[in-house]
């Protein structure tokens, strides 16, 4: 690893503390707040510099996609973070707020889970995903037709079955009481946050 600047060393120490205390890394916003940066973008630039120097590894597109080589085992022992609630009905505003940690090995799921999302609503009940369940999610940005995804539309997220034809995407409920959500990618942005890889009943 190349020599770090004092500021980079501060950031690395903060990331280590979060991993050791919580089992998951901080967001860019949390780093900015801790270190007194004006915006998360400043934290992002420092993280990129740390990655170039080999001090950390970054997962593109994931708000907590930061790893420190050698500390993965401790993170696994701490389990998976439980992140807020995700609408399995009408979409709700999704702020990635970690409620607590669940003591389960991420490797229990395949592919490996990155976090757990609390489900709110009954739109996916016919595939066994109920209100209050914890959905194990593997972070990725692409999905195939038929997969159950966590999708972001604007600042809101929802859990649905994915279907795409050309520029049209349908997010399908597994409950006849809920209508499909139709998105035209030419007019509206839709982001795949991850794939469902399991459910923990609560």
Swiss-Prot record:
Pfam families: LexA_DNA_bind, Peptidase_S24
DNA-binding region listed in the record: 28-48
Entry annotation: catalytic residues: 123 (for autocatalytic cleavage activity), 160 (for autocatalytic cleavage activity)
Protein's UniProt keywords contain Repressor: yes
Protein keywords: Autocatalytic cleavage, DNA damage, DNA repair, DNA replication, DNA-binding, Hydrolase, Repressor, SOS response, Transcription, Transcription regulation
Record-listed E.C. numbers: 3.4.21.88
Reaction catalysed by this enzyme: Hydrolysis of Ala-|-Gly bond in repressor LexA
Site description Cleavage, residues in chain: 88-89
GO biological process, alphabetically ordered: DNA repair; DNA replication; negative regulation of DNA-templated transcription; proteolysis; SOS response
Entries under InterPro entries matching the protein: LexA (IPR006200), LexA-like (IPR039418), LexA/Signal_pep-like_sf (IPR036286), LexA_DNA-bd_dom (IPR006199), LexA_repressor (IPR050077), Peptidase_S24_LexA (IPR006197), Peptidase_S24_S26A/B/C (IPR015927), WH-like_DNA-bd_sf (IPR036388)
Domain of life: Bacteria
Cited Gene3D superfamilies: Umud Fragment, subunit A (2.10.109.10), Winged helix-like DNA-binding domain superfamily/Winged helix DNA-binding domain (1.10.10.10)
Family: Belongs to the peptidase S24 family.
HAMAP family for the chain: LexA
Free-text function comment from the UniProt entry: Represses a number of genes involved in the response to DNA damage (SOS response), including recA and lexA. In the presence of single-stranded DNA, RecA interacts with LexA causing an autocatalytic cleavage which disrupts the DNA-binding part of LexA, leading to derepression of the SOS regulon and eventually DNA repair.
Protein name: LexA repressor 1
Species: Pseudomonas putida (strain ATCC 47054 / DSM 6125 / CFBP 8728 / NCIMB 11950 / KT2440)
Chain's gene name: lexA1
